Amino acid sequence: MGVFIQKYQHLCLSAWLRVREWYTSELGQALLASEKNALNDLLEQVFGYNLVQLGCLDKAGLMAKSRTCSQYVIESLKPVSHLNNHSHLITEFEQLPIQNHSVDAVILPHTLEFEANPHQILREVERILVAEGKAVFLGFNPYSTWGLWHKYWDVKNTLANKKNKHKAPHELAPLPSCGHLISQRRLRDWLQLLGFDIDLISEYFYRPPIASLVLLNKLEFMEQAGQFSRILPAGGYLLVATKRVSTLTPIRPRWRFAKGIIGTETVETAGLKTNLEPNLDPKLDLSTDQQKKENK
């Protein structure tokens, strides 16, 4: 069992290293710029004391526009050097050393896609968030050109690894082929099971995953076309969820007396009725006909 866990931890670390390396490419930088623009407008509306980011894509960070008092970056590997104005913590995402109900917002930039146990990470996010806290997710859209390209390179890398085990798989792929892409619908279902309400789902980066910066600049018109037409599938999506906590409202009992049957006294206490019958002599509790017969 220990060997199995160590194997998955090694795969997760390897995936994050490859993702971080991919974000230094021209395509990665173009996507990162779109993700920062999508987050900046959102973070300006998030207030509180503590903001946590699980996973780091580059040394610039994604919390530049945050208005929270404290920002923390939690990673599962060696942190990026010279990350400005953020405190670092290296730990496992499945067991966060954070108190319950102590974080106002959590950012997960593709975190669920490159971790072995996304369900446990979501449970940890639900645990550390305060009531009405925000969870912000960035993800790749599997039903887009990015998803098809990811699947293609995933299969190609698998075949290449069988033929040449010494060749690094990320040398072949123009985008991070590791990990498992999670659709908006699946993530929404997971969050609703944990008691979250979905506030916002937006999409970004409608251009295909082309490694050439020149071609990406020429296809800049696809961004506006995708936002207005709603036909082109976007490469990435932003999902915002709010943690809801149900509370019990105590209801004060209402005491009142109700009218009962003649000869009995009815008392109603907190909705419970009780008939109090008088202790009558059986000889007096006879009908009129029976009394006449006895008199004769």
Provide a role label for each language-model segment.
Residues 119-134:
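A short glycine-rich, Lys/Arg-flanked "PGG" loop and its adjoining helix->strand segment in the class I
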Residues 197-222:
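Conserved catalytic loop of SAM-dependent methyltransferase domains
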Residues 152, 177-201:
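Short alpha-helix
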Residues 94-106:
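A short acidic, Gly/Pro-enriched loop at the edge of an enzyme's catalytic core
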Residues 134-171:
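Conserved class I S-adenosyl-L-methionine
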